[in-house]
């Protein structure tokens, strides 16, 4: 069962994540971070960047692996996740760009039709993560339908990094990043699978707003199901879900989650 932390706002959630990761880097200078795009992690990255600066933490050895990438977008496209990760994480934290990887790096705009190259990219990415020693902390957002990464409802809970077709709702949701033109949104992606994500030693999922309330309810208190991919976190030995009041509004046991978090010993961390 994941630990549920209910916070006032995104800034408070960001501070919790930032402290967790900063302490990890101090203890393990070559820590491997799992990175995600989207709006949910932004406050977390900002909080971590501030701690790194204020405490003069050496991040030169830190490594990173992103969750996913569109297929067909060149790395230089402003909405490629390669560009987004470098803009929101690598530059603010001062990470070494050569040590931060995105599943589509080896593709760099390769079209979906180039099956020989596209099909090999997923397994190669999983091997790269394993060669780095695995991911220490993986940050996650969640879609309104319970997807994590680009693992849409129906994704195998044992899946590795592979090519997926984007759900129409996901393309509609992401059109805001493409001048509100769904025709510009790629139709396919390469994403870490649920099986890959579950290998990370610590998962931290962030969710904010009433629009995420149903997905959080299904993730935490619903049954384990491929139709809510995030529900796989119920089976992880060290998962933390940080939500604001609105995202937690449908949780039946939220009073217990608050009590458990406020009464845990400080040395346990998250």
UniProtKB/Swiss-Prot annotation:
Gene3D superfamilies: 3.40.50.1360. It is an enzyme of class 3 (hydrolase). GO terms for molecular function: glucosamine-6-phosphate deaminase activity; identical protein binding. SUPFAM superfamilies: NagB/RpiA/CoA transferase-like. Pfam families: Glucosamine_iso. The keyword Hydrolase applies. It catalyses: alpha-D-glucosamine 6-phosphate + H2O = beta-D-fructose 6-phosphate + NH4(+). Its EC number is 3.5.99.6. InterPro entries: Glc/Gal-6P_isomerase, Glucosamine6P_isomerase, Glucosamine6P_isomerase_CS, NagB/RpiA_transferase-like. NCBIfam families: nagB, PRK00443.1-4. Belongs to the glucosamine/galactosamine-6-phosphate isomerase family. NagB subfamily. This is Glucosamine-6-phosphate deaminase.
């Amino acid at each position: 069962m994941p630990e549920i932390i209910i916070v006032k706002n995104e800034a408070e959630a960001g501070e919790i994540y930032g402290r967790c990761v900063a302490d990890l880097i101090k203890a393990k200078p070559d820590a491997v971070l799992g990175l995600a795009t989207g709006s949910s992690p932004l406050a977390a990255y900002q909080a971590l960047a501030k701690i790194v600066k204020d405490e003069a933490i050496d991040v030169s050895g830190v490594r990173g692996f992103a969750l996913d990438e569109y297929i067909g977008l060149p790395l230089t496209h402003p909405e490629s996740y390669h560009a987004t990760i470098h803009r929101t994480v690598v530059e603010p934290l001062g990470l070494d760009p050569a040590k931060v990887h995105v599943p589509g790096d080896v593709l760099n705009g390769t079209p979906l039709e180039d099956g020989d190259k596209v099909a090999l990219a997923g397994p190669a990415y999983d091997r790269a993560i394993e060669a780095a020693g695995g991911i220490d902390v993986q940050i996650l957002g969640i879609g309104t339908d319970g997807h994590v990464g680009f693992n849409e409802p129906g994704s195998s809970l044992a899946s590795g990094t592979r090519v997926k077709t984007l759900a129409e709702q996901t393309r509609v949701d992401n059109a805001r990043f493409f001048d509100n033109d769904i025709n510009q949104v790629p139709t396919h992606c390469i994403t870490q699978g649920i099986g890959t994500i579950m290998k990370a030693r610590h998962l931290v999922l962030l969710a904010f707003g009433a629009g995420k309330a149903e997905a959080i309810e299904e993730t935490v208190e619903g049954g384990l199901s491929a139709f809510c991919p995030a529900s796989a976190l119920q089976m992880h030995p060290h998962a933390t879900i940080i939500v604001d009041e609105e995202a937690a509004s449908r949780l039946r046991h939220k009073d217990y989650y608050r009590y458990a978090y406020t009464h845990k010993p400080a040395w346990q961390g998250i």
